[in-house]
Design a protein with these regions (language model features):
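Generic anion/oxyanion-binding catalytic loop in active/binding sites
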Residues: 9, 34, 52
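A generic structural signal for ordered secondary structure
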Residues: 32-36, 59-64, 122
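Bacterial N-terminal signal peptides
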Residues: 5-15
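Short solvent-exposed beta->alpha transition segments
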Residues: 24-28, 42-89
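Short, low-complexity N-terminal intrinsically disordered segments enriched in polar/charged residues
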Residues: 13-39
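Exposed beta-sheet edge and beta->alpha loop/turn motif
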Residues: 84-134
Length: 134
């Protein structure tokens, strides 16, 4: 039985690309924040922001106002789909394709950093209209 479990673990580890668990964890954090925005739950949305972001926006309501004003497609949208991701030494960069409430396409690039407790938190989000040069 122990051999079967070990074999299964080895097969799973070869089936997943390097960093796949980090990408899955990052996507879970981003999705949880997106859902918090949808519920207008400022405290929950704020909890996924890294400490450096929380220093800039020291209150959940201030953070939520900033997102509403500067990241409207992230705050409210028709679709929110994960794209390519990159993992490097405790950091994850995750692209997200967004269609806003008006039907306009956007691309967001989220960055996340591993925290001392092992969790990932969002360190930033860059937002461009789809097709716009960086």
């Amino acid at each position: 039985m122990r051999t079967v479990v070990l074999l299964a673990a080895l097969l799973i580890s070869f089936a997943l690309p390097a960093g796949a668990t980090d990408v899955a964890a990052a996507q879970k954090v981003i999705r949880a924040q997106e859902q918090a925005f949808a519920r207008n739950d400022a405290a929950a949305a704020y909890s996924y922001a890294a400490p450096a972001i929380q220093e800039i926006f020291p209150d959940a309501e201030i953070f939520m106002q900033m997102v509403q004003q500067s990241y409207a497609p992230v705050y409210r949208h028709q679709s929110f789909e994960f794209g390519e991701a990159k993992v490097s030494d405790g950091y994850v960069a995750q692209r997200v394709q967004i269609v806003d409430e008006n039907g306009e396409a956007w691309e967001a690039l989220y960055t996340l950093e591993e925290q001392p407790d092992g969790s990932l938190r969002i360190t930033g989000c860059s937002l461009l209209k789809a097709g716009q040069a960086v």
